[in-house]
Amino acid sequence: MSMSSSNITSGFIDIATFDEIEKYMYGGPTATAYFVREIRKSTWFTQVPVPLSRNTGNAAFGQEWSVSISRAGDYLLQTWLRVNIPQVTLNAQLGPTFGLRWTRNFMHNLIREATITFNDLVAARFDNYHLDFWSAFTVPASKKIGYDNMIGNISALTNPVAPGGSLGSVGGINLNLPLPFFFSRDTGVALPTAALPYNEMQINFNFRDWPELLILTNTALVPPASPYVPIVVGTHLSAAPVLGAVQVWANYAIVSNEERRRMGCAIRDILIEQVQTAPRQNYTPLTNAMPTFDIRFSHAIKALFFSVRNKTSSAEWSNYATSSPVVTGQLVNYEPPGAFDPISNTTLIYENTNRLGAMGSDYFSLINPFYHAPTIPSSIGYHLYSYSLHFFDLDPMGSTNYGKLTNVSVVPQASPAAVTAAGGSGAAGSGADYAQSYEFVIIGVNNNIIRISGGALGFPVL
């Protein structure tokens, strides 16, 4: 039986191989010594999470409301929305073919729009589509399960319940949504709330109503009929669902008196990210397989997100595949055999030039995110084109000023599967065996500059 062996003396052989190429790679006055660590000191601070106070409106389904951003903390680091989802019971008198479930990505789709304002100046906004794209391209696999648990992708909410069954649990289920405003991206761009005494700062929400989020299906309805059934209170539910406790939490940094004094002493410009969503437009592969959509974005665009959303069910928001989910008993197959990317290839045109000519969807869904994004989406239908070498990086690494471009348009050619599904001629059980309808969604992520001056926030470049 052999014994493993090694000795220190052999390492000196490696050291003796130092030659010209090693002179290029090692040594010199700026070389790093990996065995003598230098401590990088920070300023003295602490951080504390606090709930924000309600300002206007009622935090309920279908309502607009807002919270005030406190100036008690020095820097606002992160914010998140915490919502209690009520238990919902399907009427026991219905037939056994009925099933009730909440939409996927519930916390994304609850939000029609969220904004942050400074004296009514909207500094940033996002909607449910941006939340879908942002999480698909930035949440790493190591956090994906936890993120799904936070936003409602759990069996207790998304698996259908039969008549007499209940979604959720007694007392409701608490869900959390990290709000991806610009100040949450890095502590270096945290919002200096203590330096803004002359701004009334608010986070504003527009919530969708519960019928836009709750899905009722009846599998007794066979193609070409759609299995989706409009929900009627009194027939399907005993009462309309009502949200439980709703809170917005904020994580603040509190700094030393010396640093606080310096915060308002000089003008400060901060490079931030903003989101622009183009108006959604109908996508009809049966009548026009190569539609042209005009894009009117502005500022320095660093990344484009786009997709074709399947809107066959108005409450099935986060479906970017050719087919609808297929319900079998108490299970849902969100990517059944008929689920494919609705887009075959895409052309991006501006200044009468093909910036990208008929690039296959595999480029936008796999290759581009492989090189330029933190992660590749695990679901069908997400597309990215990044002008930045790494769009998740805060430093400028590439962009194009869409405000200086003319006649910008995108041409997403429909895939054969989209044409088949739009006509409802897919195979039985494919989710495409009844007519599917679609809309085109495109979002731009741009850089902008905010200026902190004289106790207020503004835009030096609008």
Swiss-Prot record:
Major capsid protein that self assembles to form an icosahedral capsid. Represents around 50% of the total virion protein mass. Gene3D superfamilies: Adenovirus Type 2 Hexon, domain 4, Major capsid protein Vp54. One of its GO terms (molecular function) is structural molecule activity. The gene is MCP. Belongs to the NCLDV major capsid protein family. Disulfide bonds: none annotated. One of its GO terms (cellular component) is viral capsid. Keywords: Capsid protein, Late protein, Virion. It comes from the Viruses. Homotrimer. It is found in: Virion. This is Major capsid protein.
